[in-house]
Amino acid sequence: LFDDYEGRGKAAREQDMSIEHTLTNDWDLKLLTREEMLKDTTNRLYSVYKRMPVEVQDKWDSAYAQRIAEYRKGDLKGKALISWKYQQYMRDYLATVLAVDENIGRLLNYLEKIGELDNTIIVYTSDQGFFLGEHGWFDKRFMYEECQRMPLIIRYPKAIKAGSTSNAISMNVDFAPTFLDFAGVEVPSDIQGAS
């Protein structure tokens, strides 16, 4: 979280994705009140907030009111401010992860209810990894280990044993041939990737 970039190249030292300098109070941390958001029409959060129905705005305000008050009362600086910003960012990130998890559960329950769970290929993946405080960074712009590691979970009982893992390197271009293979369709010879 407090990497000083000693011995790292220029790109790492001059990057624009540090929790300390780049994580914004408005867009990233949602530290604006309703009045502040609606007053500044140049703020990119304004257009998102303005499109929300009033009842959703009320929920938004309620969800972030304590954070805003805590921030304004705290007068944090240096490492204390970095730590606080990191905690708020992770709180939002983990809330997103929880929402994804809950909705995957809803999907699995529905597929089971209609009798299609074991006949459905379920894939959980992402386009890239993400910095969650490593090196003092957030976001996903550098070719470091954290950004190269992507989740790839496939559930398909007809072809994959539950709980199995693989150390094989895979890429997004492998998805199409894999799905064609699962479906019993011949993979064209000119397609990129491998099943």
Residues covered by each model-derived region:
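Active-site-proximal cap/lid insertion segments
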Residues: 1-170, 182-190
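Zinc-coordinating Cys/His ligand positions in small cysteine/histidine-rich zinc-finger domains
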Residues: 172, 176
